[in-house]
Amino acid sequence: MSRIGKQPVAIPSGVDVKIENGKIIAKKGNLTQEVEFGNRVNVSIEDNKIVFSPVGEDKQSKAFWGTYRALTNNAIEGLTKGFEKKLEINGVGYRAAVKGKELELQLGFSHPILYPIPEGIQISVEKNIITIKGHDKQKVGQVAAEIRSFRPPEPYKGKGVKYVDEVIIRKAGKTAKK
């Protein structure tokens, strides 16, 4: 077990953190992130650090201990730095463009796919790279996964939408009979 919950989360300058009603509320300017922890872990703020401790000694309490520490760390990191995912489009005639509050994808279907950009997410397109940015790690990952799901990469030619750092295991095509 990694015991990640033992490590306190540092509160950077410019970020205000409050604990109320089973929630950790972090604010920076007009951005707000909330992490709901209920009564599963004990949370306190000690000398500009958020400290977590498990409620009991059972396995589930220890699991929640690390989970809520990681969620809180992601919320604070999102407010200070933000998160980014990049997708790459491969294929003849495959392209993407941002039009207003929608992402228009042409992925070899008879019609373009219009994906509405959610609140708090910025999408930019440069050649065949789609960049997704936001301050909520879960939302950024979800949007990237949804866009990828429209045309996942196929194993023969590698056509489709893939993450920039993703490796596609290629298959050999059929060979002619001798």
UniProtKB/Swiss-Prot annotation:
MF terms from GO for this chain are: rRNA binding; structural constituent of ribosome
Keywords per UniProt: Ribonucleoprotein, Ribosomal protein, RNA-binding, rRNA-binding
- Classify the source by domain of life: Bacteria
Q: Entry's Gene3D superfamilies?
A: Ribosomal protein L6, alpha-beta domain (3.90.930.12)
Q: Which GO terms describe its biological process?
A: cytoplasmic translation
Checking InterPro entries in the record gives: Ribosomal_uL6-like, Ribosomal_uL6-like_a/b-dom_sf, Ribosomal_uL6_a/b-dom, Ribosomal_uL6_bac-type, Ribosomal_uL6_CS
According to its record, what are the GO cellular component terms? cytosolic large ribosomal subunit
Protein family: Belongs to the universal ribosomal protein uL6 family.
Q: Subunit composition?
A: Part of the 50S ribosomal subunit.
Q: Which HAMAP family match?
A: Ribosomal_uL6_B
Task performed by this protein = This protein binds to the 23S rRNA, and is important in its secondary structure. It is located near the subunit interface in the base of the L7/L12 stalk, and near the tRNA binding site of the peptidyltransferase center.
Q: Identify the PANTHER family for this entry.
A: 60S/50S RIBOSOMAL PROTEIN L6/L9, LARGE RIBOSOMAL SUBUNIT PROTEIN UL6M
> What is this protein called in UniProt?
Large ribosomal subunit protein uL6
Organism whose genome encodes this protein: Nitratiruptor sp. (strain SB155-2)
Task: Tell me the lineage of the source organism.
Answer: Bacteria, Pseudomonadati, Campylobacterota, Epsilonproteobacteria, Nautiliales
- Gene expressing this chain: rplF
